[in-house]
A protein has these predicted regions:
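Histidine-centered catalytic micro-motifs
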Residues: 4-14, 38-42, 131-135
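Extended substrate/RNA-proximal surfaces in nucleic-acid metabolism proteins
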Residues: 29, 42, 47-159
Length: 164
């Protein structure tokens, strides 16, 4: 299997990441990747940048050092109803790729049925393309049901080695 893109990365505008956009693109190039999505946390996450970061993504070149740069975000799942970070439409228009993920700081782990319901609701969110790090053991859910529904709704499930 050849990996051609990394669709879940954070630059140093997210507190737990340490590389600049330029460094991330260079690393992607050095690894032979064709594309990289820059998906910093949403603005309501304590680890995320200000919303202006996402408004300014239109300034990021589409191609750097031969690597396609995908302008993205990692939305936080914030409610059992499938709520995610709220952003102004002017910021969302610069987003090409969006993940939705559970993070303990904004969604305390609950039970399997609550996690499943939240994920199912997000299947209908037109701004979300994929689910991030579903392998987090703190957020058990009905895998078979959600994965089959992702296929029906055209959503992607990330394989994240940090969760393995």
């Amino acid at each position: 299997m050849q990996i051609i893109a990394d669709l879940h990365t954070h630059t140093n505008v997210t507190d737990h990441a340490f590389s600049t956009l330029t460094e991330m693109v260079q690393a992607a190039h050095d690894m032979g990747l064709k594309a990289i999505a820059i998906t910093n946390h949403g603005p309501t996450n304590p680890d995320g940048p200000h919303e202006w970061h996402f408004s300014n993504l239109n300034l990021v070149p589409r191609k750097m050092n031969g690597v396609t740069v995908i302008r993205g975000i990692e939305f936080d799942i914030t409610a059992p109803s499938g709520g995610i970070n709220v952003m102004a439409n002017k910021s969302l228009k610069h987003i090409d790729w969006a993940l939705a993920s559970f993070h303990e700081c904004l969604f305390p782990p609950a039970d399997r049925s609550i996690h499943t319901a939240a994920l199912e609701s997000i299947l209908y969110n037109p701004y979300v393309n994929a689910f991030g790090h579903l392998g987090n053991p703190n957020f058990d859910f009905d895998h078979e049901y959600i994965i089959s529904r992702c296929n029906e709704r055209g959503k992607v499930v990330e394989i994240n080695n940090a969760s393995l």
